[in-house]
Each structure stands twice: as structure tokens, then as C-alpha cells.
């Protein structure tokens, strides 16, 4: 038997027993500070949410140790029988949530889900038609700085200037002129429901594959508060966080078996190696939660809260893009107030309200400045906020923007910050975490 004096620390117990606070107090302090920030601030970033403790536990589990290249039952490594269970649970729950035949839960992000679809059905130089970033689309839909705008001939459609809704006449004209191999719907800053049927008709007319990126509204679809794009599209991609309220990750869905096989090969071995099994376990937990009746109530409240906040912003004298929202997010045009999105974001954060500066349709300002902000209701709704709280939030936003426009927002920021702290104290998250 080995002399205990020479037993490595990993076998002596320290490696498996010493926690983060002792092992790395500097990092532990930063995590604790972030927990405190999340507790005391109102989160309005539309792409963020708050996961359950169960999701946290799954994502922080020992599944992080396991490599599992391949798919359940067809792995390239041994010892995968239990991680196979986790992935199979995630797949079956995703299929049930979205009423579809096939799901790939391995993409590490929404961007990689889109990249996987491109790898599966396109070749470099093919033409894609997607919503421009300026109109509310996403980088991966053909924006020039993104790989999708470099590898493909990316044509971009936008919104109508009079109402900021998708310009389907333009979509149809561009589709017929360019004959794209793929048409993409969905975006990161479009607050209205999308006519998927109209998009599919245009795609069929030109022989294009129709892809819907539902990263922002997938949770609304899962809970029945938004039309299901899989009733019309060939392929849907999504993140697994945002309104779906799971860990950060991606997913690809389809009803076409031939496409599903191509997608699986495109993800592995096409663009990824071993999947993140601890994250896939977190996805499985979140999908299980989304199948519960309470999730339907949650997403209905998300939409109602977003509408209440948008209406309160209008009442406060702010210009709401498209005059409202059908989803979880709203865009505020600050040009009539003479305030930039960058300044509004900073002032709101000083008041403990977190949002993001965002371009608006036909924005004259650069993306580092912007003329608007994007606000969303998912995280606040998870905390328990209802219409009353979101009306108050919209009022606070209006007060701070007005104070900025008048040249000095310090006093208003200080007052709102204390009021926000009082509100968040009534709706705590993660008892025992943060201060």
C-alpha cells in the first residue's frame, strides 16, 4: 500500500472536497457579486432569463467530466450509457414541446445551430435571404461581419418605414430576383409575430429552404403563446435560454427525416466534437419544466408584461417601434427625446435597470451608439413581476430618459435606484446566493 505521505492531493481528498470559495476566493467573490447584482437589479435584456435551481444543479453536475462524441447509442467513446439518458430525455422532451419529429440538442449556441444548418444544406457561394441587422435580424442571417455574410451571397430584406413591419413585397421581389437557396425568418429585435405561412409560400415559389430562427420566441411557442413555425418551415433553430428559460445553448428542429440526418452529420462531425453533456442535461431539465402547465401561464404573463411595459413607455412619452409588441420584447426609439441608446443604457444601469442599447429601423446612429434601447420581460416575469410592476418599470424608463434629455439625470437615477432595490427585495431569487 502506498505511503500516505506520497499520495497525490487528488487522491488524498483535497481535490474532491475543497470548494470554490477556498480554492479560488477571487473568482468566488466575483460570482457572489454577480449574484448580488442579479438579486438587486431589474433585468430587461430580452435575451436573458433566470434559470431554475434544478437547471443550475444539472449544469454544474459531474456530467461535465464526460466526453461523448456521436449520438445516443452511436458514440465514439465508451462509458456513455448514462449521458445517453440525459441526451435522449432532452431530445424527446424537445420533440414533444414543439410537436416535431426530430431534434438535435447538441449545438453549443444559437449561432452554432444556424451554422450547422448552413453546413447541412448550403455550400459556399449559395444565396441566402435574411432580415438585415438594422431591421431587427441577427448577425448569423447574413450580416457582413459574420461568417454567414462572408461564405454566402447574403441578400437582406427589411421593414416598412410606415409601420416597421416586415416588408413582404420586398421579400417577394428579392426572392424572385436572387433565387436564394435559403430564406431565413426571425431576428433579435423584431417585436411582432411573423407570418410564417407567407414566408413559406415565397420560399416554395423560388425553390428555397425556409429556415426560422426562433431563438427569441421559442419559449412562447412551447407555451402556446406564439404560432409554431414548424407548421410551415423546413427547419427551425433556437437557443435554449431566453424565453425557453434553460441553459445557454442551441437546438435544431425539423419534421423532415432526410434533413435531420444531414443536420446531425453537420453538427457532428461537421462543426463540433464532443457535446457539452452537462449543458444538455440542463436543457433536458428546462424542457421538462416547459412541459409543465405552469410554463403556459408563465409565457402568457411574459407577453402580457411586455405589452404593459410598452404601453407604459408610450404613456411616458416614449416612441415604441411598431407601436407595441406581440412577444417578450419592445424597442424604444429615443430620437424624439434627443437621447442615444448608449447614454440611456448607462443611465438605466446606474438606476439598477439593465437593458441594452439597440439599433432601430433606419437608425442613423452607429451600432456602438444607437438611437434606441431594447427591453424585455422574461427575467422579470420569472421573478414574479406582473403587469403592475412592468407598468412601474416603463414609468421609470420614461423618467430617466426625460432627465437625460434635460441634461442631468443624477437625482432621478438615485431615487429610482432605491425604488428598484425596494421592488427587487420583494421578489428574491436564489435564496442564500449573493448579498
UniProtKB/Swiss-Prot annotation:
<dbReference type="Pfam" id="PF00464">
    <property type="entry name" value="SHMT"/>
</dbReference>
<dbReference type="GO" id="GO:0005829">
    <property type="term" value="C:cytosol"/>
</dbReference>
<comment type="function">
    <text>Catalyzes the reversible interconversion of serine and glycine with tetrahydrofolate (THF) serving as the one-carbon carrier. This reaction serves as the major source of one-carbon groups required for the biosynthesis of purines, thymidylate, methionine, and other important biomolecules. Also exhibits THF-independent aldolase activity toward beta-hydroxyamino acids, producing glycine and aldehydes, via a retro-aldol mechanism.</text>
</comment>
<keyword id="KW-0963">Cytoplasm</keyword>
<dbReference type="InterPro" id="IPR019798">
    <property type="entry name" value="Ser_HO-MeTrfase_PLP_BS"/>
</dbReference>
<dbReference type="InterPro" id="IPR015424">
    <property type="entry name" value="PyrdxlP-dep_Trfase"/>
</dbReference>
<keyword id="KW-0554">One-carbon metabolism</keyword>
<dbReference type="InterPro" id="IPR015421">
    <property type="entry name" value="PyrdxlP-dep_Trfase_major"/>
</dbReference>
<protein>
    <recommendedName>
        <fullName>Serine hydroxymethyltransferase</fullName>
        <ecNumber>2.1.2.1</ecNumber>
    </recommendedName>
</protein>
<dbReference type="InterPro" id="IPR015422">
    <property type="entry name" value="PyrdxlP-dep_Trfase_small"/>
</dbReference>
<feature type="binding site">
    <location>
        <begin position="137"/>
        <end position="139"/>
    </location>
    <ligand>
        <name>(6S)-5,6,7,8-tetrahydrofolate</name>
    </ligand>
</feature>
<dbReference type="InterPro" id="IPR049943">
    <property type="entry name" value="Ser_HO-MeTrfase-like"/>
</dbReference>
<keyword id="KW-0028">Amino-acid biosynthesis</keyword>
<dbReference type="GO" id="GO:0019264">
    <property type="term" value="P:glycine biosynthetic process from serine"/>
</dbReference>
<comment type="pathway">
    <text>One-carbon metabolism; tetrahydrofolate interconversion.</text>
</comment>
<comment type="pathway">
    <text>Amino-acid biosynthesis; glycine biosynthesis; glycine from L-serine: step 1/1.</text>
</comment>
<feature type="site" description="Plays an important role in substrate specificity">
    <location>
        <position position="241"/>
    </location>
</feature>
<comment type="subunit">
    <text>Homodimer.</text>
</comment>
<comment type="similarity">
    <text>Belongs to the SHMT family.</text>
</comment>
<feature type="modified residue" description="N6-(pyridoxal phosphate)lysine">
    <location>
        <position position="242"/>
    </location>
</feature>
<dbReference type="GO" id="GO:0035999">
    <property type="term" value="P:tetrahydrofolate interconversion"/>
</dbReference>
<keyword id="KW-0808">Transferase</keyword>
<dbReference type="InterPro" id="IPR001085">
    <property type="entry name" value="Ser_HO-MeTrfase"/>
</dbReference>
<dbReference type="GO" id="GO:0004372">
    <property type="term" value="F:glycine hydroxymethyltransferase activity"/>
</dbReference>
<feature type="binding site">
    <location>
        <position position="133"/>
    </location>
    <ligand>
        <name>(6S)-5,6,7,8-tetrahydrofolate</name>
    </ligand>
</feature>
<keyword id="KW-0663">Pyridoxal phosphate</keyword>
<dbReference type="GO" id="GO:0030170">
    <property type="term" value="F:pyridoxal phosphate binding"/>
</dbReference>
<dbReference type="InterPro" id="IPR039429">
    <property type="entry name" value="SHMT-like_dom"/>
</dbReference>
Amino acid at each position: 500500500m502506498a505511503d500516505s505521505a506520497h499520495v497525490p492531493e487528488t487522491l488524498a481528498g483535497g481535490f474532491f472536497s475543497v470548494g470554490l470559495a477556498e480554492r479560488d476566493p477571487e473568482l468566488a467573490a466575483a460570482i457572489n457579486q454577480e449574484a448580488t447584482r442579479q438579486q438587486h437589479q431589474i433585468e430587461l435584456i430580452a435575451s436573458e432569463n433566470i434559470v431554475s435551481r434544478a437547471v443550475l444543479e444539472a449544469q454544474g453536475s459531474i456530467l461535465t467530466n464526460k466526453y461523448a462524441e456521436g449520438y445516443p447509442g452511436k458514440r465514439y467513446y465508451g462509458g456513455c450509457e448514462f449521458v445517453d439518458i440525459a441526451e435522449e430525455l432532452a431530445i424527446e422532451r424537445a420533440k414533444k414541446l414543439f410537436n416535431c419529429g426530430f431534434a438535435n440538442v447538441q449545438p453549443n449556441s444559437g449561432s452554432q445551430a444556424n451554422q450547422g444548418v448552413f453546413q447541412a444544406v448550403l455550400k459556399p457561394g449559395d444565396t441566402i435571404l435574411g432580415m438585415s441587422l438594422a431591421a431587427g435580424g441577427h448577425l448569423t442571417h447574413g450580416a457582413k461581419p459574420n461568417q454567414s455574410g462572408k461564405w454566402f451571397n447574403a441578400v437582406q430584406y427589411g421593414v416598412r418605414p410606415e409601420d416597421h413591419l416586415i416588408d413582404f413585397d420586398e421579400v417577394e421581389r428579392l426572392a424572385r430576383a436572387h433565387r436564394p437557396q435559403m430564406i431565413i425568418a426571425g431576428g433579435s429585435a423584431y417585436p411582432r409575430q411573423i407570418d410564417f405561412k407567407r414566408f413559406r409560400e415565397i420560399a416554395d415559389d423560388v425553390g428555397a429552404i425556409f429556415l426560422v430562427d426562433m431563438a427569441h420566441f421559442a419559449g412562447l411557442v412551447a407555451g402556446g403563446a406564439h404560432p409554431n413555425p414548424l407548421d410551415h418551415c423546413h427547419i427551425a433553430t433556437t437557443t435554449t435560454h431566453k424565453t425557453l428559460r434553460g441553459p445557454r445553448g442551441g437546438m435544431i428542429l425539423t419534421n423532415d427525416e432526410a434533413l435531420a440526418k444531414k443536420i446531425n452529420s453537420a453538427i457532428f462531425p461537421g462543426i463540433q466534437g464532443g457535446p457539452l453533456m452537462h449543458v444538455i442535461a440542463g436543457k433536458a431539465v428546462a424542457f421538462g419544466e416547459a412541459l409543465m402547465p405552469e410554463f403556459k401561464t408563465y409565457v402568457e404573463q411574459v407577453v402580457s408584461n411586455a405589452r404593459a411595459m410598452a404601453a407604459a413607455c408610450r404613456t411616458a412619452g416614449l416612441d415604441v417601434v411598431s407601436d407595441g409588441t406581440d412577444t417578450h420584447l419592445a424597442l424604444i426609439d429615443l430620437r424624439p427625446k434627443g437621447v442615444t441608446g448608449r447614454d440611456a443604457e448607462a443611465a438605466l444601469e446606474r438606476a439598477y435597470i439593465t437593458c441594452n442599447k439597440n439599433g432601430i429601423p433606419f437608425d442613423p446612429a452607429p451600432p456602438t451608439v444607437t438611437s434606441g434601447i431594447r427591453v424585455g420581460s422574461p427575467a422579470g416575469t420569472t421573478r414574479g413581476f406582473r403587469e403592475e410592476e412592468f407598468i412601474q418599470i416603463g414609468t421609470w424608463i420614461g423618467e430617466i430618459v426625460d432627465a437625460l434629455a434635460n441634461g442631468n439625470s443624477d437625482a432621478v437615477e438615485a431615487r429610482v435606484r432605491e425604488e428598484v432595490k425596494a421592488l427587487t427585495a420583494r421578489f428574491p431569487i436564489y435564496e442564500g446566493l449573493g448579498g
